UniProtKB/Swiss-Prot annotation:
Belongs to the pyruvate, phosphate/water dikinase regulatory protein family. PDRP subfamily. NCBIfam families: PRK05339.1 (NF003742). Bifunctional serine/threonine kinase and phosphorylase involved in the regulation of the pyruvate, phosphate dikinase (PPDK) by catalyzing its phosphorylation/dephosphorylation. The lineage of its organism: Bacteria, Pseudomonadati, Pseudomonadota, Alphaproteobacteria, Hyphomicrobiales. Its EC number is 2.7.11.32, 2.7.4.27. InterPro entries: Kinase-pyrophosphorylase, PPDK_reg. GO terms for molecular function: ADP binding; ATP binding; phosphotransferase activity, phosphate group as acceptor; protein serine/threonine kinase activity. This is Putative pyruvate, phosphate dikinase regulatory protein. ADP binds at G153, I154, S155, R156, T157, S158, K159, T160. HAMAP family: PDRP. It catalyses: N(tele)-phospho-L-histidyl/L-threonyl-[pyruvate, phosphate dikinase] + ADP = N(tele)-phospho-L-histidyl/O-phospho-L-threonyl-[pyruvate, phosphate dikinase] + AMP + H(+); N(tele)-phospho-L-histidyl/O-phospho-L-threonyl-[pyruvate, phosphate dikinase] + phosphate + H(+) = N(tele)-phospho-L-histidyl/L-threonyl-[pyruvate, phosphate dikinase] + diphosphate. It holds the Pfam family Kinase-PPPase.
């Protein structure tokens, strides 16, 4: 019998950089070896306008929702919508803050990002996060030369979570999907500053992740083609040929965590350290 890995969607919503939340989510998920999370990270969510698309993304791919949102109105909206969708939501900091308030006999300030010292490193991370979110999934292709790293790869190779992990370390990162037969943007080929790296994985790994990705998604997918191993093999072959043609390095993420993938990228460009 084929040894398959179970996957689940893990949505991480933060009004700051998301580092605290990512660490908590990974610490918890590491205790469950039978399933691996597909991380969806949403940093810098500070108003209703920013939150509504996140809630739609959760509705499209239901799973566990963890959040660190100081604003009570936004936190309540997350909980209400998650109840409507029938998914679990956890305000990760609230029990800790309540314990502090009871022990200290004083209310919290409820200030966004209060744990961060406003130094140059913090502002560099925020700038990198803003850049990375603006350049996710092929968006805003005209200024790739402002990036430190551009990650390319076919669907479900962890481009977005790796990009956000790098951004949390002050590395401006864009990511672009490789779609079989669709040319990459011309601006990528003339960009001289960024390190361009391609993420790949085994056909079986990608197929498994994609099969779990389409669970609960009612529209927008040709499911059979999206998860077909032969089609995925062709996509990977196409990605490899692009990288060989342009001398772009490949990183196989099949057995790598996001942290390990990010470290491998940084190792390719020592000045990013």
């Amino acid at each position: 019998m084929e040894n398959r890995t179970n996957f689940f969607h893990l949505h991480l919503i933060s009004d700051s950089t998301g580092e605290t939340l990512i660490s908590a989510g990974r610490a918890a998920s590491a205790q469950f070896r039978s399933a691996q999370p597909i991380e969806h990270v949403y940093p810098l969510i500070r108003n209703r306008k920013q939150l509504l698309p996140v809630l739609q993304a959760i509705d499209d791919a239901p799973g566990i929702v963890l959040y660190t949102i100081v604003d009570r109105e936004l936190a309540s909206l997350i909980d209400e919508r998650c109840i409507e969708m029938g998914v679990a939501s956890v305000n990760v900091l609230e029990p800790v803050m309540n314990a502090f308030q009871i022990y200290l006999g004083a209310p919290s300030r409820r200030r966004v990002g209060a744990q961060h010292v406003m130094n140059a490193g913090y502002f560099a991370r925020i700038e990198a996060l803003n850049f990375t979110m603006d350049h996710d999934d092929g968006q805003m292709p005209d200024d790739y030369n402002d990036a430190d790293v551009v990650i390319i790869g076919i669907s479900r190779t962890s481009k977005t979570p790796t990009s956000i992990y790098l951004a949390n370390r002050g590395i401006k990162t864009a990511n672009i999907p490789i779609v079989y037969g669709v040319p990459l943007p011309e601006s990528l080929f003339v960009a001289s500053k960024p390190l361009i790296v391609c993420l790949i994985a085994t056909t079986d790994r990608i197929s498994q992740v994609r099969e779990n990705r389409v669970l609960g998604v009612t529209q927008g997918f040709d499911r059979e083609h999206y998860t077909d191993r032969a089609a995925i093999s062709e996509e990977l072959k196409y990605a490899r040929s692009l990288c060989a043609r342009h001398n772009w390095p490949l990183i196989d993420v099949t057995r790598r965590s996001i942290e390990e993938t990010a470290a491998a990228i940084v190792a390719l460009r020592p000045k990013l350290r």
